[in-house]
């Protein structure tokens, strides 16, 4: 190098610089041109790498948008997926625009673009499947609405049909009661005629008729109502004879010819017996025919209600199975739904067979059958549509994976091409530098030494980057010459390489996140299945407890929000049934308590009646004393002042006694009215027994010879019921007479009280009106004697009321026993400790 320096030292500095710089400039120019070419190639490759990285991120967004579309298939989510697909198509087109058809990676980009177009087609298929599913779901919802409406209409119509049959049966029973009233009237007249014929004297005959006149007038009122329209004249004739008989009995003179007239009236009444019995028999025959016609209708109404309930229960189970199927549209759930629909069809066929001739059954059966078929067909199509949608989504996901693989392969090809181009650029740069060194070896040794260091550093840095050492620092980036540009281009390459690696790491993280999201979705589906299974098991346990009579068992654990209404409806149904039985128990307890209270009241009434009798005796004695006092007052005018004082005290005591007697008679009258109501209940019971005996006789007559013995027993029961009814009517008549007598006695006692008040006033005036006292005393003595007679009669009636109160007490205990039996029937159900303890408390009382 010394000789070069000596050679150059002979030239001027500018010439030397020019001589030294010219070869250096030439070599640098060659290296610069080579660097520019390499930098352009690298920038193009890095732009393509950026587009590929953006596409990879975008396809992750596409996959996430497709998952959202599958979970919630809406127009917004569909538009979002297409928007993401359009963005990826634009990115792929931008990457392809930088390549020629023969460039490396062109085939991979074309494959990815074709797969992207296929995804667009599959999205259209998914949307069409969603539209089919929405149509099928709407059809199922519409069919379910028809089923619910038809279910309610069927139950309402069946209940109305059953009620109409019951109404016809009640009408037939009422006609049977009319026949019984007709026969009872004829039997009563015959018995009264026999009693009159067996009289010992005329007075006894009149008393017998007078005693029976109240009941006879009752028959007079009831008979025209009970007779059929064509037999109304018989009722008028019966009423005319009863009025004639009443007029003869009410005749105070009672001449002997009245006996003949009474016998004539009885003869006319006897003549009415046969046509009245014929009318009653005709009514009973008509009732028997009606009962025969109603037997089939009653049985049919029971079967219709039974089949309707079976169909209703099957529909409820089908609705539960349908709810489970809509949450999990699997073949297994569809099979379960089909099984329940088959049960509904069987129940519907049974109802159609039973009630086929009824208009409501045929109309609703057609609607229900059509709805069952529609739900079953829609469920099958839903299973297929759900499977197709899953397949289409999986195919789209596979195509996205294929696109990712193609883009990754394209990125690898671009990476390899960039490496080769980098090596080519390095070789060109080294060749240019060697050539420049050779050309300027002598003349530009110093300049070569000056340029060799930076170029060597850049070369080494490029080798390190090509070898994967991305942490290598790029020197000379701040130079303004071509070396600086090469350093900056190299730094951009390093930065893009780092970004690509970071992008690959983020893509891996997003793939892991997508896998975790799929696992969460599967866990959510498993949780929903468990919630449905729990709800079904809880309902099954509740129904089993209800079947065993445990009405206190409810479902306390809440279901899932979508299923919790089943739990609340079930609990409400159990609570309603339990409350109904509790109401029955409460009513039975009230009847039980009322029966005991009636018995105790009757017992207390008997005791008070005895006390009243004693009080009446004391009152009679007091009245006798008053009579004696008044007589002595007339004879002993001289002792008027002392007598006035004593009479005033006696009058005050008598006023108190009369007030007590009036109040006691009021209580007796109220008790008699209550006893009358009890007698009406007993009469109704006797009528029901008579009705049952008559029905038994009709059935025995149908049985022929085999039913004769049963017919005899039924006749005996019927006669016993008639005697019971007759006894009840006699008691009612006695109570009516007692009530009338008590009312009369109360009036007399009230008059007595008024008289005693007048006595008190007159006693105050005795001092100045001694003579008037004597006259008034005689008048008062006469009045008080009449009062004494009335009190004696009242005492007899009071004794009779005591006997009736004892009979009422016995009837009340019988009523209480029947209420106890009803309580035992209700106690078979488990209605809770509170209700049970209340029942035991009532029984203990």
Swiss-Prot record:
GO terms for cellular component: plasma membrane. It comes from the Bacteria. Residues 587-816 form the Methyl-accepting transducer domain. It is found in: Cell membrane. Its main location: membrane. Keywords: Cell membrane, Chemotaxis, Membrane, Methylation, Plasmid, Repeat, Transducer, Transmembrane, Transmembrane helix. It is a multi-pass membrane protein. InterPro entries: HAMP_dom (IPR003660), MCP_chemotaxis (IPR051310), MCPsignal_dom (IPR004089). The chain crosses the membrane at residues 17-37, 430-450. Chemotactic-signal transducers respond to changes in the concentration of attractants and repellents in the environment, transduce a signal from the outside to the inside of the cell, and facilitate sensory adaptation through the variation of the level of methylation. Attractants increase the level of methylation while repellents decrease the level of methylation. Belongs to the methyl-accepting chemotaxis (MCP) protein family. This is Probable chemoreceptor y4fA. It comes from Sinorhizobium fredii (strain NBRC 101917 / NGR234).
């Amino acid at each position: 190098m010394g000789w070069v320096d000596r050679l150059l030292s002979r030239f001027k500095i500018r010439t030397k610089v020019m001589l030294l710089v010219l070869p250096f400039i030439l070599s640098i120019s060659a290296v610069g041109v080579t660097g520019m070419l390499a930098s352009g190639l690298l920038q193009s490759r890095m732009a393509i790498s950026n587009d590929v990285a953006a596409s990879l991120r975008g396809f992750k967004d596409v996959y996430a948008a497709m998952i959202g579309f599958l979970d919630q298939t809406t127009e917004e989510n569909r538009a979002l997926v297409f928007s993401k697909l359009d963005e990826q198509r634009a990115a792929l087109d931008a990457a392809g625009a930088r390549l020629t058809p023969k460039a490396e990676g062109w085939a991979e980009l074309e494959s990815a673009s074709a797969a992207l177009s296929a995804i667009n087609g599959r999205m259209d298929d998914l949307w069409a499947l969603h539209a089919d599913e929405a149509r099928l779901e709407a059809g199922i919802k519409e069919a379910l609405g028809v089923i619910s409406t038809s279910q309610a209409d069927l139950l309402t119509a069946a209940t109305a049909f059953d009620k109409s049959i019951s109404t016809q049966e009640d009408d037939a029973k009422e006609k049977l009661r009319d026949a019984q009233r007709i026969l009872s009237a004829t039997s009563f007249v015959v018995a009264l005629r026999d009693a009159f014929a067996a009289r010992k004297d005329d007075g006894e005959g009149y008393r017998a008729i007078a005693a029976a006149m109240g009941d006879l007038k009752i028959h007079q009122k009831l008979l025209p109502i009970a007779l059929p329209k064509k037999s109304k004249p018989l009722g008028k004739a019966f009423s005319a004879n009863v009025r004639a008989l009443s007029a003869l009995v009410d005749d105070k003179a009672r001449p002997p010819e009245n006996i003949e007239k009474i016998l004539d009236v009885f003869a006319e009444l006897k003549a009415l017996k046969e046509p009245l019995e014929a009318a009653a028999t005709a009514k009973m025959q008509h009732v028997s025919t009606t009962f025969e016609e109603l037997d089939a209708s009653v049985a049919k109404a029971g079967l219709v209600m039974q089949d309707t309930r079976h169909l209703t229960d099957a529909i409820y189970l089908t609705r539960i199975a349908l709810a489970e199927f809509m949450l999990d549209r699997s073949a297994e759930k569809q099979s379960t739904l089909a099984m329940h629909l088959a049960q509904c069809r069987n129940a519907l066929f049974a109802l159609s067979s039973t009630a086929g001739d009824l208009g409501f059954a045929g109309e609703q059966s057609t609607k229900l059958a059509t709805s069952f078929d529609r739900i079953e067909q829609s469920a099958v199509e839903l299973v297929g549509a759900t499977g197709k949608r899953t397949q289409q989504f999986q195919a789209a996901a596979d195509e996205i994976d294929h696109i990712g693989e193609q883009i990754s392969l394209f990125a690898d090809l671009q990476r390899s091409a960039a490496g080769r181009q980098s090596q080519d650029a390095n070789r060109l740069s080294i060749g240019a530098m060697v050539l420049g060194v050779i050309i300027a070896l002598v003349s530009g040794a110093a300049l070569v030494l000056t340029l060799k260091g930076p170029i060597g550093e850049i070369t080494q840095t490029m080798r390190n980057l090509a070898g994967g050492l991305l942490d290598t620092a790029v020197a000379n980036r701040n130079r303004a010459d071509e070396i600086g540009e090469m350093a900056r281009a190299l730094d951009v390459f390093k930065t893009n390489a780092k970004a690509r690696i970071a992008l690959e790491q983020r893509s891996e993280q997003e793939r892991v996140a997508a896998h975790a999201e799929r696992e969460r979705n599967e866990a959510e589906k498993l949780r929903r299945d468990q919630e449905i299974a729990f709800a079904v098991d809880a309902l099954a346990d509740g129904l089993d407890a209800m079947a065993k009579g445990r009405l206190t068992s409810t479902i306390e654990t809440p279901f899932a929000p979508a299923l919790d209404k089943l739990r609340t409806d079930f609990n409400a149904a159990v609570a309603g049934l339990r409350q109904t039985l509790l109401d029955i128990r409460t009513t039975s307890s009230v009847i039980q308590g009322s029966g005991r209270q009636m018995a105790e009241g009757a017992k207390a009434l008997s005791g008070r009646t005895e006390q009243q009798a004693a009080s009446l005796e004391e009152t009679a004695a007091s009245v006798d004393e008053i009579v004696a006092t008044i007589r002595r007052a007339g004879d002993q005018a001289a002792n008027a002042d002392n007598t006035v004082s004593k009479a005033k005290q006696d009058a005050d005591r008598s006023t108190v006694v009369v007030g007590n007697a009036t109040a006691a008679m009021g209580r007796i009258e109220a008790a008699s009215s209550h006893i009358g109501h009890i007698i009406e209940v007993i009469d109704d019971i006797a009528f029901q027994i008579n009705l049952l005996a008559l029905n038994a006789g009709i059935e025995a007559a149908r049985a022929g010879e085999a039913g004769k013995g049963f017919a005899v027993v039924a006749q005996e029961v019927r006669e016993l019921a008639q005697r019971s009814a007759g006894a009840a009517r006699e008691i009612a008549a006695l109570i009516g007479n007692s009530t009338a007598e008590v009312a009369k006695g109360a009036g007399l006692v009230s008059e007595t009280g008024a008289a005693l008040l007048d006595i008190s006033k007159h006693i105050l005036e005795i001092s100045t009106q001694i003579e008037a006292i004597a006259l008034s005393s005689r008048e008062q003595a006469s009045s008080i004697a009449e009062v004494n007679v009335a009190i004696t009669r009242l005492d007899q009636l009071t004794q009779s009321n005591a006997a009736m109160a004892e009979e009422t007490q016995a009837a009340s205990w019988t009523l209480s026993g029947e209420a106890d039996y009803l309580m035992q029937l209700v106690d078979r159900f488990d209605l809770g400790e509170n209700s049970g303890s209340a029942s035991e408390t009532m029984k203990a009382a």
